[in-house]
């Protein structure tokens, strides 16, 4: 359901995985159901946006069309309940600081760790000033059920158009985000490339 919003032609159905004795079977009705798998159309990984960008094979018109498609999905996406905690100023701040904690655990060469600490301190000091804006966006309905993992490797050229796929299904907190944050992930990835 979630990924068909972005790529209805890529997602076929959900297959049952069963255990039949010592064997796992996909799509079988025999045995105990142990899991489910999403069945998708197989596409050429060379058509993923990261590979296309690397080869210089992306046209501005394609990116414009992708932006229009994502905006259309966002405009129809379910708004997150303001009482759910999704998109609350406290949660946005915590996610921001958690990202810095994860990055600080990486073995990065200097001056990156020093710069990350400076940026983290700035973000922590600036967060209280941004909290009213975050609250305003929450109340205005900009926190919605988004893609949640929108980056170049999760976009493919399929049937001559760029199409987002592989959105977050396993964790509602990662997909119930501000629509601006959803598109920002892809924008930053494109800018970095």
Regions found by a protein language model. Name each.
Residues 1-2, 108:
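Generic detector of contiguous secondary-structure segments
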Residues 2-9, 76-77, 190:
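Structural motif at the C-terminus of the N-lobe alphaC helix and the adjacent alphaC-beta4 loop
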Residues 3-7, 18, 42-47:
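Generic hydrophobic/packing signal
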Residues 24-193:
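ATP-dependent phospho-/nucleotidyl transfer catalytic cores
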